[in-house]
UniProtKB/Swiss-Prot annotation:
Name listed for the protein in its UniProt record: Sulfur carrier protein TusA
Gene responsible for this protein: tusA
Function comment: Sulfur carrier protein which probably makes part of a sulfur-relay system.
GO cellular component: cytoplasm
GO biological process: tRNA wobble position uridine thiolation
Length: 79
């Protein structure tokens, strides 16, 4: 686990690509710059999709735990 301050949590357990990334985009759109979203997922595609989403949308992937499910991703909203 990590001690990163979380502003919001998004549970995407049971959802499959592209739903986790679509919900991530929708959720982070309503957050303030600098806030942190914790995404909880079990879709193996998220291991590549979340980092690609962050890079493409200029958000920062602060940390990820992908060794076991559920996967966890800490995303800091960019501009």
């Amino acid at each position: 686990m990590t001690d990163i301050k979380i502003d919001q949590t998004l549970d995407t357990l049971g959802l499959r690509c592209p739903e986790p990334v679509m919900l991530t985009r929708k959720t982070i759109r309503n957050m303030a710059e600098g806030e942190v979203l914790l995404i909880v997922a079990d879709d193996p595609a998220t291991t590549r999709d979340i980092s690609s989403f962050c890079e493409f949308m200029d958000h920062q992937l602060l940390n990820s735990e992908t060794e076991n499910t559920p996967y966890r991703y800490w995303v800091k909203k960019g501009l």
